[in-house]
């Protein structure tokens, strides 16, 4: 018999993690492109090169850190990922040169797009045997929701606050 209460919790966990993976997704970080370029005085090409390099390095590190999910209980691994995303977001708000921008984008891509989505997908895939496809499609609605909500919210907040806030 399937415990629906636990199933719901796992789906909610996956949904939340895929939603917050958006902090490292291109659609989200792209919202900060113009204010960062203007403040740092860099071109589209320079920003693109930094972004591409940071993405490649974050994907390489994900190969090593991602497999650690098999060595730790999910509560500890997920807590690590949450703290890392929080610290990455905090670090991102202090960017004031291209070197910090490189590290900031790397951290956001690694913790958000990389580890948050990896953690949600791996956890849900492990838990669901029969309805794995349904469960995964449900949790990935979290990213679709973020793609709808966050650009509107961030654009509105840019009117009131600096991009660093």
Where are these regions (language model features)?
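Helix-to-loop junctions at the C-terminal end of transmembrane segments
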Residues: 61-73
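C-terminal ends and interior cores of transmembrane alpha-helices
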Residues: 83-96
